[in-house]
Amino acid sequence: ALRQTENAVREALEERGYSEIITPAVEYFDVFAQANPELDQDQMLKIIDKSGRICVARPDNTTPIARIAATRLDDAALPVRLYYSQKVFRSVSGDHGHKGEFLQVGAEFIGADGLAADKDILSAAFAALSRTGVDNFRIELGHAEIYKALIEELGADEASAEGIRRLIENKSFAALGDALQPFGSKPAAKALGAMP
């Protein structure tokens, strides 16, 4: 079933002009630490290469795709539509049946912004999900600036802000409610509590 779902998504994206990109499974730690400081470094699976440099098993797909786009696709006609279907690796505390290896399928629309770009990627996501045969799905939109603005409005200290971010990311809604309780009925607390 997993392979059929993956193939259905691939077909839908390719029909919309998205090309597959495959990135290295092992990258230098610095690629992720500098480009995406929001990634939890404690969850990265670290490897030391023979020259002593710290490498990681790919914890995310967007960061290496952005690196490749910036270094190897700089003369490509814009916009560039890419999709990936590859595993990411993260250290999972307590295991709980998870082995730290997750298939991640997604798409990147590079070189344009605004409403037309948003429409393109959202219609591709809708088509891909529809193709899988699932008829009851929800598309969640995330933008780091929304979260940052709400945290600033909330007046949370750095430790509280990081804790709230992780709870939202992990969809730990009961714990999120507890973490937001000290902020009372502030509109920013209500908005953060309603984030998907």
Language-model features and meaning:
Residues 1-63, 67-196:
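Extended, charged alpha-beta segments that form solvent-exposed binding/catalytic grooves
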